[in-house]
C-alpha cells in the first residue's frame, strides 16, 4: 500500500518526505526539483512494541512499515500536460491514498508559484487538476457502457447513467470521493481508477511561530481545516522545518526536543499513523525472545489469512490462534500470568483480527 505526497511546487513536500524517510530528495527553491518520484519505506510508530521489548528483551524488533512516494509538484494545467503534468498524474494513479501538502507559511526566500500564499486556492488548484483528469476517464467509460448496451443489456445502460451523473458532479469541480451514491454504486465507481476518488489527508505545513501558536486562530490553517471538514477528510498540522531538525537528532535528543515543544509525538509520526488508518490497515503482534514484530493486515482480515502473512504454511495448515489483547498483556506483565488469569483466548478460522492482538498461530502441514 502506497501513500503519495502531492502538492504545488515549493510547499515543503520534499522537505517532509526527507524528514519521513531520512532521504535526500531534491528540496530546491524551484518547481520540478523532484521529477521521478522518490520512494521511501517508513516505520509505523507503535509504542506497544516498546512495552513488549521490556517484557521479552528480544534479539530483534520489526515494526510495521508503510510506503511513501514523493511526487513532483503539480501545477495548474497539469491535466492538459502543463509542467510535467501527464507524467505526474500517472504517478498519482499508482498510489492508494494521497497526502496533500498545503503551504501555510510565509517566507520571502521561498517563491510561491502563484505569488502569494492562499491555502484554499492551492487546494482547489490541485483538486481541479485531478478532477479534470478524471472527466476524461469517465467520458470514455460512458462511451464503452453505451456501446455495450446496444445489444439490449440493461446493466451497462444503468452503469452509463451512473457515470453520467458522476460526470456532471465532476464538471462542477467536485471530487469523486464526495459523490453521493449507494454502496453498490461506490463499488462500480471504484473499478474506474479515478484520482479524485482516492482518500486524502491534508498536511498544513506551518512556520515555527505559527505551529507554536493557537491553530484555531490561524487564518491560513483554518482555510485547510474548513475544506477538510466539508469533505470528511483529516488535517495533520506540522512544521516542516521542525520535522527536518527532529529527523537529524538522536532518539533521546529528539524526545527532549519534543517535550520542550510540549509535544508527545512528532507531526510526522502523527501523519504516518493517520496514513496507516486511512488505508484501512491495522497491526497484529507476535512476541518472543527471537523477535517482537508488528504485522500489517487490512481491517476485517480473518485469523487464517493473518497467519498467512507470516508464512503460507501457517494459513494452509491453520488449526487455531492463541490470542491476547495487548492491554491485557500489558496489565499482566508476562504471558504466563495472562494464561493463569484466563486472558489468552483460543480463536478459530472465522475470528476477525483486532488491532493490537498478540497472537501465536497453531498449524499443521
Language model features: what each stretch is:
Residues 40-45, 72-82, 93-154, 169-182, ...:
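Conserved Switch II/interswitch segment of TRAFAC-class P-loop GTPases
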Residues 24-32, 39-41, 49, 58, ...:
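Generic secondary-structure boundary/loop-capping signal
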Residues 2-6, 11, 17, 144-352, ...:
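C-terminal-of-GTPase-core extension/linker across diverse P-loop GTPases
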Residues 1-111, 139-140, 144-145:
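Conserved G1/Walker A P-loop phosphate-binding module
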Residues 22, 54, 90, 128, ...:
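Short, intrinsically disordered, mixed-charge
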Residues 6, 32, 37-40, 47-49, ...:
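Short capping/connector residues at structural and topological boundaries
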Residues 32, 46-49, 62-68, 82-96, ...:
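Amphipathic alpha-helical transducer elements in NTP-driven molecular machines
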